[in-house]
Design a protein with these regions (language model features):
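Hydrophobic faces of transmembrane alpha-helices in multi-pass small-molecule transporters and flippases
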Residues: 2-7, 117, 121, 144-151, ...
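Hydrophobic transmembrane alpha-helices of multi-pass small-molecule transporters
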Residues: 40-43, 157-158, 187-191
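Helix-loop interface residues and adjacent transmembrane-helix termini in multi-pass membrane transporters
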Residues: 11, 22-25, 139-140, 167-169
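Alpha-helical transmembrane segments of multi-pass membrane transporters/permeases
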Residues: 79, 136-162, 173, 177-180
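N-terminal transmembrane alpha-helices
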Residues: 1-18, 22-23, 39-51, 83-87, ...
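Interfacial/gating helices of multi-pass transporter permease domains
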Residues: 19-39, 107-112, 172-173
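Small-residue-rich hydrophobic transmembrane alpha-helices
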Residues: 28-88, 127-146
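Short alpha-helical transmembrane segments in multi-pass integral membrane proteins
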Residues: 56-123, 167-201
Length: 205
């Protein structure tokens, strides 16, 4: 499940690149460029979340449920704060970041990349929360929950892409919006599951 989940995590951008091809080469190139940034951020957030979840796992191993709940809440807070900071930096430095990483690129490719980067950057806080929740579930050996949530995220993304591209003809903005919506929903699902009383990861109130 863990390997499959990791594949699903990075497949969102791949699907976006594939489905936006109808909008032209510039759209494909722009989305593909930003997808490189997104994949790097996903790996960083996943690694940080996994490290934080180890603490919660240790408390669970020692049967200290209260501290495990507290550490889970702290991890969610830290990840949401960090990813929100990344969002702000990405929104403010949109053009500068693209220019710095990729150098001089064609105007139409740059515009597509900027649009996709701007909209998907809004999803970073939700991506951070999802990664935190997924890591916490994996830490107690319940990787199926995070895998299934990731699968749902991908299904929503594919359906959203189809709707926004083929029905509303939104191009790059459409695939970015579908990605944003899918990550919001996945974060809501993972937090909801964590809050259910039958898990040991109920968020502290």
């Amino acid at each position: 499940p863990l390997i499959f989940e990791q594949l699903l995590a990075v497949s969102v951008g791949f699907v976006d690149t594939f489905m936006v091809s109808i909008a032209g080469e510039a759209a494909v190139s722009g989305v593909a460029l930003v997808d490189n940034i997104s994949n790097l951020l996903i790996q960083i957030l996943s690694a940080l979340a996994t490290g934080g979840a180890v603490v919660c796992s240790q408390y669970l191993g020692s049967r200290n449920i209260n501290m495990s709940k507290k550490s889970a809440g702290q991890l969610i807070f830290i990840m949401s704060t960090l990813s929100s900071l990344l969002m702000v930096i990405s929104l403010i430095g949109n053009h500068g970041i693209i220019n710095f990483i990729f150098g001089k690129i064609e105007k139409d490719v740059f515009e597509s990349a900027s649009i996709y980067f701007y909209i998907t950057a809004i999803s970073y806080p939700f991506l951070g929360v999802y990664n935190a929740g997924a890591a916490l579930f994996r830490s107690i050996g319940n990787s199926k929950i995070s895998m299934n949530t990731s699968l749902i995220m991908n299904i929503i993304n594919i359906c959203g892409n189809a709707l926004f591209i083929f029905v509303f003809d939104m191009g790059v903005a459409g695939v970015a919006l579908a990605t944003l919506i899918s990550r919001i929903i996945s974060a809501i699902i993972i937090i909801g599951l964590m809050s259910v009383s039958y898990t040991h990861l109920t968020l502290p109130t």
